[in-house]
Amino acid sequence: MKVLCVAEKNSIAKAVSQILGGGRSTSRDSGYMYVKNYDFMFSGFPFARNGANCEVTMTSVAGHLTGIDFSHDSHGWGKCAIQELFDAPLNEIMNNNQKKIASNIKREARNADYLMIWTDCDREGEYIGWEIWQEAKRGNRLIQNDQVYRAVFSHLERQHILNAARNPSRLDMKSVHAVGTRIEIDLRAGVTFTRLLTETLRNKLRNQATMTKDGAKHRGGNKNDSQVVSYGTCQFPTLGFVVDRFERIRNFVPEEFWYIQLVVENKDNGGTTTFQWDRGHLFDRLSVLTFYETCIETAGNVAQVVDLKSKPTTKYRPLPLTTVELQKNCARYLRLNAKQSLDAAEKLYQKGFISYPRTETDTFPHAMDLKSLVEKQAQLDQLAAGGRTAWASYAASLLQPENTSNNNKFKFPRSGSHDDKAHPPIHPIVSLGPEANVSPVERRVYEYVARHFLACCSEDAKGQSMTLVLDWAVERFSASGLVVLERNFLDVYPWARWETTKQLPRLEMNALVDIAKAEMKAGTTAPPKPMTESELILLMDTNGIGTDATIAEHIDKIQVRNYVRSEKVGKETYLQPTTLGVSLVHGFEAIGLEDSFAKPFQRREMEQDLKKICEGHASKTDVVKDIVEKYRKYWHKTNACKNTLLQVYDRVKASM
């Protein structure tokens, strides 16, 4: 019996073939230099009679095998009215490399009895699996539904891969239809509005250095003119968040405020403690002055202790790691942009160091053996000449026997509220020694993943919080302090700050306290800071713009399109909109479409429709028809208001 297995990337095909073939696979050329065919024998497929030994060929694609586009001859740039593209037929297309990969799949499928898909286990992976199946059928029409299986896996640990081969499922056609829906809508909306915007703004921008140079790469782009103003259903809401912050800063009007502050000497250590006014601050100077003078006249420099609290407090360990948290925290802590961190995580996954990095799940299944993963972090790396990671001793301490003095023992991670039912949270699979073949960025991302995982498997940090409340005449002031008693997870997770503060004065209830200093102070409200990538990731995730796996791509695209640029200020990197980016957002706002392109609502509704398709509550045909009709209506209104876009561009350019 012959089985053809196809992975999404050659690195996965190579790793899986080594495991299933017991290290005895042989490789041969596929016709495309970056894809190999791996041949081996394997027994254990459930469809093989009595678990018989099967001849297996493992190969791969390189991402999507096909694309869709309009016919260049009839619907290329300038060859048709733009609005015709809302109804124009779509053709399946392949570039030269995809054709070579497709030929290999057809050739290998000719003698195959079964096809097993080993693409990534997400929505996009299901669609790529379907593309593979369609190509395999062209090589062997006998490969129908019953002959197609789908391996379900989330990392490249040996036993996990063997279980995936022995317990396959079927392709999820609902997910396939959802991705097909998204691809068609993005193409029709993207090309129609890209051509309209480009033709409208081309003359304005022809000599501007602010234009992107990738027109030939963008579907629907004009190969003869790189001055393309592209539209994307996710990129515009992403741009909208950045422009909104920019305008809040630009239009900010500072306000002066006033407040009262007390300082009390701490006789135990010779220091001082500052007590903050419970009213915070007020914007009326006369009111604050009245409170201040009343207190001085009534109580002088004496306050009274009216409340004294001391209670245990906890700093919770982090929840298990999702894709969004990985990108957000790598941007915040490691100064890596979302694309850098996700690309590094992908490579670590392909090399077998971490689990699949595209997941919304923040809950580990209770049946999962996490202690064995902690043990691997504690082990010496045999390939690294006895080298240990900086956190190996911490991992070992989590596994110490119960009768040791260490209170920080292994504890099953907290459970979040998300479970995509496809992949567990991101976690390390094997330890990474000093000599591992990884880049510096990959090593930093691995360290973050490993430390985050160990923090999840640790005890919460424990401390004692104290609050001291004083009455100064009719006004109340308070000071708080913290003593950290057990650091626990903080010892392995340096990005969480929780430190012991200055000791509060030791005072008794109702005691009278001499005030060393009582001041009425002034301050000024400050504008928000420019948008950071970490903040943008959180906003996109909260508002349903893109998926955990595509957020990085959308942020990258608005910079490639030159709608946004990154600026480094000190250690922080901020995102600032360009003149073109601001004018596009304000231009569409001035046109007044029913659903603003720069707001998240329209794309969020589309993501909800795609989810309904995945759940079987909506069909591809209905969703495509409904959303394309909306875009058709918006296109006609935009086309009728083209001059508005030009006027807004001039206005924005003059103001910046």
Curated annotation (Swiss-Prot):
Enzyme class: isomerase
Keyword terms, alphabetized: DNA-binding, Isomerase, Topoisomerase
PROSITE patterns: TOPO_IA_1, TOPO_IA_2, TOPRIM
GO biological process: DNA recombination; DNA repair; DNA topological change; double-strand break repair via homologous recombination; mitotic sister chromatid cohesion; reciprocal meiotic recombination; regulation of DNA recombination; telomere maintenance via recombination
Any one GO CC term of the record: RecQ family helicase-topoisomerase III complex
Function per UniProt: Releases the supercoiling and torsional tension of DNA introduced during the DNA replication and transcription by transiently cleaving and rejoining one strand of the DNA duplex. Introduces a single-strand break via transesterification at a target site in duplex DNA. The scissile phosphodiester is attacked by the catalytic tyrosine of the enzyme, resulting in the formation of a DNA-(5'-phosphotyrosyl)-enzyme intermediate and the expulsion of a 3'-OH DNA strand. The free DNA strand than undergoes passage around the unbroken strand thus removing DNA supercoils.
E.C. no: 5.6.2.1
Family matches, as PANTHER family: DNA TOPOISOMERASE 3-ALPHA, PROKARYOTIC DNA TOPOISOMERASE
Additional remark text: Present with 468 molecules/cell in log phase SD medium.
Residues annotated as the enzyme's active site: Y356
UniProt organism field: Saccharomyces cerevisiae (strain ATCC 204508 / S288c) (Baker's yeast)
Protein name as catalogued: DNA topoisomerase 3
Catalytic activity: ATP-independent breakage of single-stranded DNA, followed by passage and rejoining
SUPFAM superfamilies assigned to the protein according to its UniProt record, in alphabetical order: Prokaryotic type I DNA topoisomerase
Complexes and interactors: Forms a complex with SGS1 and RMI1. Interacts with SGS1.
Ranges where the Toprim domain occurs: 2-156
CDD domains: TOP1Ac (cd00186), TOPRIM_TopoIA_TopoIII (cd03362)
Top-level taxon of origin: Eukaryota
Gene3D superfamilies: 3.40.50.140, Topoisomerase I, domain 2, Topoisomerase I, domain 3, Topoisomerase I, domain 4
Family of this protein: Belongs to the type IA topoisomerase family.
Keyword flag tRNA processing: no
GO molecular function annotations of the record: DNA binding; DNA topoisomerase activity; DNA topoisomerase type I (single strand cut, ATP-independent) activity; RNA topoisomerase activity
Domain Topo IA-type catalytic: from-to ranges: 172-635
